[in-house]
Amino acid sequence: MSVEYYLSLYAKYNSKNLDVFRNMLQVIEPSGNYHILHAYCGIKGLDERFIEELLHRGYSPNETDDDGNYPLHIASKINNNRIVAMLLVHGADPNACDKHNKTPLYYLSGTDDEVIERINLLVQYGAKINNSVDEEGCGPLLACTDPSERVFKKIMSIGFEARIVDKFGKNHIHRHLMSDNPKASTISWMMKLGISPSKPDHDGNTPLHIVCSKTVKYVDIINLLLPSTDVNKQNKFGDSPLTLLIKTLSPAHLINKLISTSNVITDQTVNICIFYDRDDVLEIINDKGKQYDSTDFKMAVEVGSIRCVKYLLDNDIICEDAMYYAVLSEYETMVDYLLFNHFSVDSIVNGHTCMSECVRLNNPVILSKLMLHNPTSETMYITMKEIEKDKLDKSIIIPFIAYFVLMHPDFCKNCRYFTSYKRFVTDYVHEGVSYEVFDDYF
């Protein structure tokens, strides 16, 4: 093993001695194989004299390691301003870009004083302010998603444009809201600096869209952004801040806050309330003056929203054919709820009955529930006609029809009903049976 290899191992040693380090350097020729300078620049709290010795020995501050990092980037990332200064004095390029197309100015970790000191150092040695754009289309300031006010204003004072957006159209407020812990105070001073709180990005999302879509609801931020944004403004996916709040199961009082600022409640908002089973929000919307009708009840049945069905039912809003749509959706719980509330099993839509659709869906469980609730003879007649017309499998309904006829003697007294029933059963019993063996006898 070369001495340079042992020098790379020494970088990991906790108690480093500068004299030992110098002795090791005396027998080393820089090879570039072990990225020695990079390794030592990445040690937190390292005495800058170690770096100075490496630089004097011939290690270049302008070479990249295997990850595309320069020593200056590494020192900036770990917030070691003394090493940053040492590298700059020895010719490190403050405008070099790593593999993410970021210059050292992008790495602004540390306290406000430390960050401002590092900015001053980099600018003093020629860092260019406005010509670096990373992979997301951000300059150094825009890439910093959670800056302090002091740092933000410091960078602006040396030439950064505060109103730029990234390649997705997101400005500083958008990007701050995407950080782990966005703060209303940060957004407030950004707004005072002229950054728009209502600007949509390329997907049509305003800052209010973003904060309303977050799992954690930052009420203070919503209150701050609410006056500047229409809560019904849709992004390109059709979502508004209001619908995003509903979709993320936000508390009703917060949704009410947005509704109170809106002059119009759209049908889309009502539909989303129903889809997400938000009867509490339906009540808020109703108090706002929105009227519901049978179409809303039908949708609630189709999506299986028991709460919304109950709310609408309590407010005398129904759909006469609700049972039919519950069968189509195959929501057994909804079927049970409607049966309990005495909804008719005799719904007929476009010639289809609830029973014929059970056969079409091959759902004997729901069929058995419906047959126990006494469909009329006319309904059963239409059911048989529909099954025969569409050539559906009769096997699951034959036992139910036989029992129905047995329990309804009047059914057979009607010539039309009885003839249809006889043909229905006879065709099923004789289906696929060949009588060719009897040809010689006739």
Curated annotation (Swiss-Prot):
Induction pattern: Expressed in the early phase of the viral replicative cycle.
Stored InterPro entries: Ankyrin_rpt, Ankyrin_rpt-contain_sf, Multifunctional_ANK_Repeat
Purpose of the protein: Inhibits host apoptosis. Acts by associating with host apoptosome.
Family matches, as PANTHER family: ANKYRIN (PTHR24123:SF142), ANKYRIN REPEAT-CONTAINING (PTHR24123)
Gene Ontology cellular component list: host cell cytoplasm
Keywords assigned by UniProt, alphabetized: ANK repeat, Early protein, Host cytoplasm, Host-virus interaction, Modulation of host cell apoptosis by virus, Repeat
GO process terms (BP): symbiont-mediated perturbation of host apoptosis
ANK-type repeats, residues: 67-96, 100-131, 203-233, 237-267, 292-321, 323-347
Name of this chain's protein: Inhibitor of Apoptosis OPG037
Pfam families tied to this protein: Ank_2 (PF12796)
Domain of life where this protein originates: Viruses
Localisation: Host cytoplasm
Family the entry assigns: Belongs to the orthopoxvirus OPG037 family.
Record text on subunit structure and interactions: May interact with host caspase-9-Apaf-1 complex.
